[in-house]
Regions:
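Short acidic/glycine-rich loops and adjacent helix/strand connectors
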Residues: 1-226
Length: 226
């Protein structure tokens, strides 16, 4: 789902093979050496319609986008995810190299949805293009408030910039936090089956589930900003 499920594509990618990489690059996207790109709008519908892609896109890959309500994830979807992830990594690496070449900077700041692609960020970090990489965590519209505030502070109020080598952001966990009683009530209202475990037993069961190849969701503390 657009603007909410992109992280699932990154998570699904390791289970597939990038067999559609060339098809994507030959038909859907023109990538320049500096990382800039142009999408072939013949395959997309978001600029003029209510869907992201069109029938020509479906015919290119031989399938329509998956209906999450009644269609299971198949190897095809895993391979599509792996292919898109690889193309995304290529673009981000080219962007990073061209920025370094043009501006000769030691540090890189990233923001936005794609900036939360930690696999691609890891590739940039591993290549040592920059000494340090900092990612602003609020990737959606909420993050724009930070830029608006800083623009007003520096451009309108002529506030003097203070350059610091340290990360002054003390954390992104600025959202609500739920108590044990609130969590229990919510689970009861939903009719969910649940156990309340002591810390040691909880950790042991979590490790056991992970060793058995199960997926574990961990809910704790405050929600992240953005």
């Amino acid at each position: 789902k657009v603007n909410s499920g992109e992280y699932k594509l990154m998570g699904l990618a390791p289970y597939g093979k990038p067999i559609f990489e060339n098809k994507i690059k030959n038909n859907l996207i023109d990538i320049k050496e500096d990382g800039s790109f142009r999408l072939n709008q013949d395959y997309f519908n978001y600029a003029t319609g209510l869907t992201m892609t069109n029938n020509k896109f479906n015919n290119l890959f031989g399938q329509k986008p998956r209906n999450s309500k009644n269609e299971k994830i198949t190897q095809f979807h895993m391979d599509i995810a792996a292919s898109i992830q690889k193309v995304t990594e290529e673009i981000m690496l080219k962007f990073a190299r061209s920025l370094k070449k043009e501006y000769k900077l030691n540090n890189l700041c990233l923001a936005g949805g794609v900036a939360l692609n930690c696999v691609a960020n890891g590739k940039i970090l591993k290549e040592k293009i920059f000494e340090k990489i900092w990612v602003q965590p609020a990737s959606g519209d909420a993050g724009g408030s930070l830029g608006a505030a800083l623009a007003y502070l520096y451009d309108e109020k002529n506030y003097k910039r203070k350059i610091s080598t340290n990360d002054d952001m003390q954390g992104s966990y600025l959202g609500p936090k739920y108590s044990q009683d609130e969590i229990i009530k919510q689970l009861e209202d939903l009719g969910a089956d649940f156990d309340i475990l002591e810390d040691d037993e909880l950790l042991n069961r979590t490790v056991e589930d992970l060793n058995n190849g199960k997926a574990v969701g961990w809910f704790q503390g405050r929600m992240e900003f953005g």
